[in-house]
Each structure stands twice: as C-alpha cells, then as structure tokens.
C-alpha cells in the first residue's frame, strides 16, 4: 500500500540531506551559468505529478498503450502552446533534452557520413553542432565555421565559402556561447545557394525569442530545436518546431523522435513544458526577458570599465564571454575563486584559446537566473564589481570571504522562492 505520508526524509535521510543542501545552495549562491535558471513552483508541481507513472508510446490519438486519454490532452496542450509561442505549425514536445532533439533532426534529415556545417565549439557552438567528440562529429562529416577575429562576430563570408566548397547537406545555426545577434536570413540564403537544409538550435535564446526581443529563426529555418529550460525557464527537456510547411519533414521528425531515438515520452515533463509555455505567453514574461538583456549589458559595462575584455566587445542577449588571456588568469582558477565567493560561473574556451578545454582562458556568464530572483541593473552592476574584485585578487581568500558575505546578504534580500 502506498501512503501519501511516505517521504524521502524518513526513508532515505542521506539522499534527503543532499537534496536539502542543493536547495540551500541555490538560495544562498548567485547563479551565473548561462544555461541555468529557476523554474516556477507550477512547473515543479507538474513535474512531480503522477503523470510520471504513465507509459504513452506514440503520439496523441495514436498510442501503443491504452489509458492515454488524459495524457493525450496534456501533450496536445503542450504542442498547441509551443506553436502559439513561436509561430510554428509543427511541434514535437517529446525530446528528453536538447541534444536528443538535435539527434532526431540529424536522424530525420541526413544519412550517416553526410556533410554538415556548424559553428565550432571553440568559437561558441555546441557539442551537437559537429564536435569530434559528439555523435554529430563521429557519424557525420562535420565542417566548422567560427568568428571573425576582428569583430568577434560570426564570419558569414567564411560560412559561405565553406558551404560552397564542401556542399553540406545541412547548415546549423545557433550557439552555446555567443553574445551577438545571428543573421538567420543570411544563413538561410547560404543554405539555399547549395540546396542544403537550414537547421537552427535556438536553445540559449528561446526565451528571448518567445518574448520578441531577439530575432526568431522560425520563419527562416527548415527545423528549429530548443531546450525548455535555460531562458525559457521551464523543466529540463527538448522541443522541435517548424513552420516550413513540409509535411514530409514533419513525419520524418516524428519518426526520428519515436521510435527512432526514444521510447515512451516523459508525460510529467511534458506537462511541465505545457505549464512553462503558458507562463511564457504571459505579458510579464516579456518584462522578464527584457530585464535579462539589460542585466547582462550592465555587467559588461562594469567589467569593461574595470579593464576586462569581452568577446565581441558587447552582448545583445543573455550571456557574454569574459576573455582572461590578457590577465593571465585561467578559466579554471577564476571559476574556483568565484565559487569560493558563492558566485557560480563556468570556465569556457574563448576564440583562439591557447589552453585546453579543461583549463580554458575564459568564463561564460549569463543573467537569466539572477534576473529570475529579482536583480535589476543596479544589483547586476554591483555583482559585476564583486566579480572583478575577486579576479583582481585571484589568490586572496580574504577578498573572496568579503564578497561571500555580500552575496549572502543580497541572496537573503532577493530569494529564489519567496
């Protein structure tokens, strides 16, 4: 007999302690990892529901199991809301993660060994855009483009030259560490010149796009994928959308997700996605996303005043890359020092980085999580100053201790969950 009174704390105190400590860490530390965010209690409620008990292989109205009439409603709500949010006419809400969504696109549109052209991981791309350590670089002939060394922006001339030379079957747009605005129309124009598919991974900026403050790739791409967390602030998961109008492509995508790459969908996560999409359709979501960009730009301004180099010299979205080569500080050391001050970032390679990916010469910093807990420009500028204080005195633990106390105070003032 399962009783509602059953709980983790009584049954598994060791696990409960780890969960409690992580909950406290999220409240007491400042989160600046660009891919992390806080989902709402409504999303948490949906994800913790009894929907997790239900198997539902297939799609709404076309299941391989009985008893799916209610999860059909849940999934259709998620599909309809995703389409409304992004202006698409096709949505698959079943991918367990962004990487699985990307894998489904490869499986649907390509054959093993086909050539793809994507952004280099070293210049701000993603593992699934052709990195040699990932399936996208192991199973496919991956060619990589990067940034213009002078401007720090995507080198579209290089993209076109590589496309004309290698004739990829698919060109990939999107990034995991790029602070500029991507010219989706230009990339589609290049793809059309060689008859290639144009696929966009908008995972990092999906929330900004949903709010209408970053250009949407949906009118330009054959297929678009995203995660549902990051700037969208939903549960961890993936999403595939399209407005290309090609039913043959839609059918291939559905088959690539199930049965091609996954079995049963995670119904509880799909419910949480539906909640998050509804939240993103509210007017206050645009206010939030606008503040996300303002906060990132405020931090950049302070760091530049303090003598720190920003890749591309600016940010036009939620993140930026701090280039520490001229400071002779490794990303690894900077990450550790800031972590000791209870400021969580991630080390990140910068263009033409002389150090290994395990050490790096940069930091990736993002503003979605701090904005979610109420930071505005004033707090963001103050925070940027604290970061510079720590980096200016990278080995001084007393400075880290001073900043840690300031972090403690502002986190108490602006809790994640009030």
Swiss-Prot record:
<comment type="similarity">
    <text>Belongs to the SHMT family.</text>
</comment>
<keyword id="KW-0663">Pyridoxal phosphate</keyword>
<comment type="pathway">
    <text>Amino-acid biosynthesis; glycine biosynthesis; glycine from L-serine: step 1/1.</text>
</comment>
<dbReference type="GO" id="GO:0035999">
    <property type="term" value="P:tetrahydrofolate interconversion"/>
</dbReference>
<feature type="binding site">
    <location>
        <begin position="356"/>
        <end position="358"/>
    </location>
    <ligand>
        <name>(6S)-5,6,7,8-tetrahydrofolate</name>
    </ligand>
</feature>
<feature type="binding site">
    <location>
        <begin position="125"/>
        <end position="127"/>
    </location>
    <ligand>
        <name>(6S)-5,6,7,8-tetrahydrofolate</name>
    </ligand>
</feature>
<dbReference type="InterPro" id="IPR049943">
    <property type="entry name" value="Ser_HO-MeTrfase-like"/>
</dbReference>
<keyword id="KW-0963">Cytoplasm</keyword>
<dbReference type="GO" id="GO:0030170">
    <property type="term" value="F:pyridoxal phosphate binding"/>
</dbReference>
<comment type="subunit">
    <text>Homodimer.</text>
</comment>
<keyword id="KW-0028">Amino-acid biosynthesis</keyword>
<dbReference type="InterPro" id="IPR015422">
    <property type="entry name" value="PyrdxlP-dep_Trfase_small"/>
</dbReference>
<feature type="site" description="Plays an important role in substrate specificity">
    <location>
        <position position="229"/>
    </location>
</feature>
<protein>
    <recommendedName>
        <fullName>Serine hydroxymethyltransferase</fullName>
        <ecNumber>2.1.2.1</ecNumber>
    </recommendedName>
</protein>
<dbReference type="InterPro" id="IPR019798">
    <property type="entry name" value="Ser_HO-MeTrfase_PLP_BS"/>
</dbReference>
<dbReference type="InterPro" id="IPR015421">
    <property type="entry name" value="PyrdxlP-dep_Trfase_major"/>
</dbReference>
<comment type="pathway">
    <text>One-carbon metabolism; tetrahydrofolate interconversion.</text>
</comment>
<dbReference type="Pfam" id="PF00464">
    <property type="entry name" value="SHMT"/>
</dbReference>
<feature type="modified residue" description="N6-(pyridoxal phosphate)lysine">
    <location>
        <position position="230"/>
    </location>
</feature>
<dbReference type="GO" id="GO:0004372">
    <property type="term" value="F:glycine hydroxymethyltransferase activity"/>
</dbReference>
<dbReference type="InterPro" id="IPR001085">
    <property type="entry name" value="Ser_HO-MeTrfase"/>
</dbReference>
<comment type="function">
    <text>Catalyzes the reversible interconversion of serine and glycine with tetrahydrofolate (THF) serving as the one-carbon carrier. This reaction serves as the major source of one-carbon groups required for the biosynthesis of purines, thymidylate, methionine, and other important biomolecules. Also exhibits THF-independent aldolase activity toward beta-hydroxyamino acids, producing glycine and aldehydes, via a retro-aldol mechanism.</text>
</comment>
<dbReference type="InterPro" id="IPR039429">
    <property type="entry name" value="SHMT-like_dom"/>
</dbReference>
<dbReference type="InterPro" id="IPR015424">
    <property type="entry name" value="PyrdxlP-dep_Trfase"/>
</dbReference>
<dbReference type="GO" id="GO:0019264">
    <property type="term" value="P:glycine biosynthetic process from serine"/>
</dbReference>
<keyword id="KW-0554">One-carbon metabolism</keyword>
<feature type="binding site">
    <location>
        <position position="121"/>
    </location>
    <ligand>
        <name>(6S)-5,6,7,8-tetrahydrofolate</name>
    </ligand>
</feature>
<keyword id="KW-0808">Transferase</keyword>
<dbReference type="GO" id="GO:0005829">
    <property type="term" value="C:cytosol"/>
</dbReference>
């Amino acid at each position: 007999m399962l009783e509602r009174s059953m709980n983790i704390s009584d049954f598994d105190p060791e696990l409960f302690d780890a969960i409690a400590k992580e909950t406290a860490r999220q409240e007491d530390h400042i989160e600046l990892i660009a891919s992390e965010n806080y989902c709402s209690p409504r999303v948490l409620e949906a994800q913790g529901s009894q929907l997790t008990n239900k198997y539902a292989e297939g799609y709404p109205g076309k299941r391989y199991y009985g008893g799916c009439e209610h999860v059909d409603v849940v999934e259709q709500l998620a599909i309809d809301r995703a389409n409304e949010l992004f202006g698409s006419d096709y949505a698959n809400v079943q991918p367990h993660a962004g990487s699985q969504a990307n894998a489904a696109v490869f499986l649907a549109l390509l054959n093993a060994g086909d050539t793809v052209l994507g952004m280099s991981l070293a210049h701000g791309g993603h593992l699934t855009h052709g990195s040699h350590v990932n399936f996208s670089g192991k199973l496919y002939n991956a060619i990589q483009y990067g940034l213009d060394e002078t401007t720090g922006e995507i080198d579209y001339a290089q993209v076109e030259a590589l496309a004309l030379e290698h004739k990829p079957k698919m060109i990939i747009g999107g990034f995991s560490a790029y602070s500029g605005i991507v010219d989706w129309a230009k990339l589609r124009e290049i793809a059309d010149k060689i008859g290639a598919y144009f696929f966009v991974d908008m995972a990092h900026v999906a929330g900004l796009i949903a709010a209408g403050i970053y250009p949407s790739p949906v009118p330009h791409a054959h297929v678009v994928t995203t995660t549902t967390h990051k700037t969208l602030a939903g549960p961890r998961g993936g999403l595939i959308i399209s407005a290309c109008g090609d039913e043959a492509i839609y059918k291939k995508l559905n088959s690539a997700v199930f049965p091609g790459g996954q079995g049963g969908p995670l119904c509880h996560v799909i419910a949480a996605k539906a909640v998050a999409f509804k939240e993103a359709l509210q007017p206050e979501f645009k206010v939030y996303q606008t503040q996300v960009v303002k906060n990132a730009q405020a931090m950049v301004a302070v760091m530049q005043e303090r003598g720190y180099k920003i890749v591309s010299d600016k940010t036009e979205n939620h993140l930026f890359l701090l280039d520490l080569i001229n400071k002779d500080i490794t990303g690894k050391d900077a990450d550790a020092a800031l972590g000791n001050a209870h400021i969580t970032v991630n080390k990140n390679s910068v263009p033409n980085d002389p150090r290994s990916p395990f050490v790096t010469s940069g930091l990736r910093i993002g503003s979605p999580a701090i904005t979610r807990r109420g930071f505005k420009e004033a707090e963001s500028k103050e925070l940027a100053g604290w970061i510079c204080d720590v980096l200016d005195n990278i080995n001084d633990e007393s400075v880290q201790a001073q900043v840690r106390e300031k972090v403690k105070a502002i986190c108490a003032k602006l809790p994640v969950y009030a």
